[in-house]
Curated annotation (Swiss-Prot):
Residues 20-301 form the Deacetylase sirtuin-type domain. This is NAD-dependent protein deacetylase sirtuin-2. It comes from Pongo abelii. Inhibited by Sirtinol, A3 and M15 small molecules. Inhibited by nicotinamide. Inhibited by a macrocyclic peptide inhibitor S2iL5. Inhibited by EP300-induced acetylation. Transmembrane segments: none annotated. The gene is SIRT2. Binds 1 zinc ion per subunit. The modification Phosphoserine is found at S16, S63, S170, S331, S335.
Length: 352
């Protein structure tokens, strides 16, 4: 009954003009909103586009995207490299690719450090990331700040359901760079980084955090994602209708038919251009440049540039001294099987 009442109410309001939530639908309008008392909790939704300036390819860009450059692995089709059934039979292509993309070879970008500033200023409610490169962690976001929707290289587990032995980042790194297929020390089954493959469950944390976070968000900041992968893409519709949404991306994303989206329970998508637009802003270009532009409007530009410079210098110093990340040296341990309420990935879901 509540669904029907809500559906009827939304249907009647489709043609009504909502009051704008920003004084203008521009980056400047978003900046002024962020400086007001109304903006206290920001959720970031991020994808591969925030890491490309670090040298990590995205998945879909023509010629330079990951899926256009997998010929050397002789896969039956590009997506097979992230299919759990193919991985269990032929793990070598994935681990060869993992060596090229392994965390620790790249530095966080301006986008990552902009989110760090949001955290330091007490504005970051949560970062939901599709990325598996752990750059958010390297930039200073902590476990509590993150929802790694498509998993992470940070930990790995034995694929045997009866074992599930856990291994730290340092253990997996040694195996990958030695070009040794990682095998469990207990049962000799394959060990896989905790990234979400086709046919695997999303982390339960994705759903538990989503249910509470989006009830209290004041601003949704979407960066570097095509918003094509479900259920991550549906997160933009979880924000209340009274919450502004800013997209920083090379092209517009997340737009959909409002009536169809409402019927399917996935909201109306982004509306940047219609006469009824009232809360959505798109800044088109490189994500780093978008964050710099926003930081300048907020009066944070020098602080952001200094943070990037200081943190990159620290990473370089640690690399030169061979200092390991202390958070990657934990001992292997057992983990319980995944929770039963974790949802399965769809065919379109893939690490991004």
């Amino acid at each position: 009954m509540d669904f029907l009442r809500n559906l009827f109410s939304q249907t009647l309001s489709l043609g009504s003009q909502k009051e704008r939530l920003l004084d203008e639908l521009t980056l400047e309008g978003v900046a002024r909103y962020m400086q007001s008392e109304r903006c206290r909790r920001v959720i970031c939704l991020v994808g591969a586009g925030i890491s490309t300036s670090a040298g990590i390819p995205d998945f879909r860009s023509p010629s330079t995207g990951l899926y256009d450059n997998l010929e050397k692995y002789h896969l039956p089709y590009p997506e097979a490299i992230f299919e759990i059934s193919y991985f269990k039979k032929h793990p070598e292509p994935f681990f060869a690719l993992a060596k090229e993309l392994y965390p620790g070879q790249f530095k966080p970008t301006i986008c990552h450090y902009f989110m760090r500033l949001l955290k330091d200023k007490g504005l970051l409610l949560r970062c939901y990331t599709q990325n598996i490169d752990t750059l958010e962690r390297i930039a200073g976001l902590e476990q509590e700040d993150l929802v790694e929707a498509h998993g992470t290289f940070y930990t790995s587990h034995c694929v045997s359901a009866s074992c599930r032995h856990e291994y730290p980042l340092s253990w997996m790194k040694e195996k990958i760079f030695s070009e040794v297929t990682p095998k469990c020390e207990d049962c000799q089954s394959l060990v896989k980084p905790d990234i979400v493959f086709f046919g695997e469950s999303l982390p339960a944390r994705f759903f538990s955090c989503m249910q509470s976070d989006f009830l209290k968000v004041d601003l949704l900041l979407v960066m570097g994602t095509s918003l094509q992968v479900q259920p991550f893409a549906s997160l933009i519709s979880k924000a209340p209708l009274s919450t502004p949404r800013l997209l920083i991306n090379k092209e517009k994303a997340g737009q959909s038919d409002p009536f169809l989206g409402m019927i399917m329970g996935l909201g109306g998508g982004m509306d940047f251009d219609s006469k009824k637009a009232y809360r959505d802003v798109a800044w088109l270009g490189e994500c780093d440049q978008g964050c710099l532009a926003l930081a300048e409007l907020l009066g944070w530009k020098k602080e952001l540039e200094d943070l990037v410079r200081r943190e990159h210098a620290s990473i370089d110093a640690q690399s030169g001294a061979g200092v390991p990340n202390p958070s990657t040296s934990a001992s292997p341990k057992k983990s319980p099987p995944p929770a039963k309420d974790e949802a399965r990935t769809t065919e379109r879901e893939k690490p991004q």
